[in-house]
Regions:
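Short, flexible loop/turn elements at secondary-structure junctions
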Residues: 8, 49-51, 103-105
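A short, basic N-terminal segment
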Residues: 1-45, 65-94
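Phosphate/oxyanion-binding active-site loops and adjacent basic polyanion-contact surfaces
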Residues: 16-28, 53-59, 108-116
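Walker A/P-loop nucleotide-binding motif
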Residues: 41-61
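P-loop NTPase nucleotide-binding core
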Residues: 59, 64-154
């Protein structure tokens, strides 16, 4: 029996965003607009759907749009322009540093904080650390302290 499922890779999410075969882009764009109009508070968002209903693709497509509008994100200029053209809104989204964290991938790790930090480090954000590498280390140590209760900063 042939499998017709599509793996939720970044390339496939981009292709579905470009081609819009199931007419879902409007929902993706509405969600990006919702994020853009949220106040500066903390929010939790739950996406509920059956297995295989497209939650992962939805999140990855939202991430692509946000990344395309973030000048600090590594992305080919042509891809960035095409995604920005697809997302036609009165306002461009805020510039967010996005991190895709797949909890199932890291399910067997003992310390979820380390896997989260790893996922963030692989996120594709540009960073100029040449001016203040010690500040970066201090910030990383403070995050470690906060999550572990250990005291690296003293």
């Amino acid at each position: 029996m042939r499998n017709y499922s599509l793996n939720p890779t970044e390339e496939n999410a981009y292709k579905l965003l470009r081609e819009n075969p199931i007419q879902r882009n409007e929902y993706v764009f509405q969600f990006v607009r919702l994020l853009t109009h949220m106040e500066d508070n903390c929010y939790s968002v739950a996406l509920n759907g059956d297995w295989g209903s497209g939650k992962t693709f939805f999140v990855k497509q939202v991430k692509l749009i946000l990344d395309a509008h973030n000048p600090q994100f590594h992305m080919k200029d042509e891809t960035r322009r095409e995604i920005q053209t697809l997302y036609k809104a009165d306002e461009k989204p805020n510039s967010y540093a996005t991190v895709y964290y797949d909890a199932w991938t890291y399910d067997n790790h003992d310390d979820p904080i380390l896997s989260l930090v790893y996922a963030a480090s692989q996120s594709g954000q540009k960073a100029d650390l040449s001016d203040s590498p010690s500040h970066v280390l201090e910030a990383a140590a403070a995050v470690f302290d906060a999550f572990t209760g250990k005291n690296l900063t003293s």
